[in-house]
């Protein structure tokens, strides 16, 4: 399987060191007269090169945490540090640039452009993200490498409608890898898949940590959450449990490096 070599991101890039630190995070919506607390004083850290799960039932606040980790939403109080850099202090433009350079997002419902092939969907991500510091003439090779990592290279020229749900999610993973971000964030990546396909997609994501990626995923599935190397359990906007340093259950695969 091919590998995209992740660039260094300060001292926190060393495996096991905190890459992301969430401190006393709260999110409150509504007016002064009628407030709704979505998150209340949430604190946790995400180790570099970990497979990190945010687990909880519907309404627990896990999607809100995800949106704040990607910079889509701002916290009411508290802060998020990425390799020591505080996201809340960034302007909207700076935050958008940061997100484009550092985060690849995998959506629950794939969000592939239906009129573009799998390869073209990945190439579009390169176009929108600036090409991951590659020359344009190298984009196609990078896109094919990403599809190979996600194990759908043989589906490169098919439209999403001709792919199974699991294959579409793998293309979405390839797209998230296109600009070689150090962080992959996935929103219920196995939620719409049958159990066998879900575990196959999970193993693909877990394998990315061996290539230097930090993979963060939201799930309501306790079995999927338990397979992570670290996780938090949310309930009603609070962290009710934290689990660190579990073993990731995934079969080892040979890696062939591709340097940009």
Regions found by a protein language model. Name each.
Residues 1-14:
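Pre-NBD coupling/linker segments of ABC/ABC-like ATPases
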Residues 238-260:
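Conserved beta-strand-loop-alpha-helix hinge in the C-terminal portion
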Residues 19-20, 26-234:
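ABC family nucleotide-binding domain
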């Amino acid at each position: 399987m091919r590998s995209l070599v992740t660039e260094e991101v300060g001292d926190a890039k060393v495996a096991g060191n905190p890459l992301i630190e969430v401190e006393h995070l709260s999110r409150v919506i509504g007016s002064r007269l009628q407030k709704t607390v979505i998150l209340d004083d949430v604190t946790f850290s995400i180790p570099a090169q970990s497979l990190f799960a945010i687990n909880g039932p519907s309404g627990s606040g896990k999607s809100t945490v995800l949106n704040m980790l990607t910079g889509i939403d701002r916290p009411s109080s508290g802060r998020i540090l990425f390799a020591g850099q505080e996201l809340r202090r960034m302007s909207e433009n700076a935050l958008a640039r940061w997100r484009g350079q550092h985060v690849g997002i995998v959506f629950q419902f794939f969000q592939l452009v239906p009129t573009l092939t799998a390869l073209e969907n990945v190439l579009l991500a390169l176009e929108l993200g600036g090409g991951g510091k590659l020359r344009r003439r190298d984009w196609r090779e990078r896109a094919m490498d990403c599809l190979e990592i996600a194990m759908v290279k043989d589906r490169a020229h098919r439209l999403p409608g001709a792919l199974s749900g699991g294959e579409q999610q793998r293309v979405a993973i390839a797209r998230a890898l296109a600009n070689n971000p150090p962080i992959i964030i996935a929103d219920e990546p196995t939620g719409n898949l049958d159990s066998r396909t879900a575990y196959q997609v999970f193993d693909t994501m877990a394998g990315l940590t061996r290539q230097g990626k930090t993979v963060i995923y939201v799930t309501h599935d306790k079995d999927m959450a338990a397979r992570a190397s670290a996780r938090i359990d949310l309930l009603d906007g609070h962290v009710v449990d934290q689990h660190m340093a579990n073993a990731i259950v995934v079969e080892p695969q040979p890696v062939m490096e591709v340097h940009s």
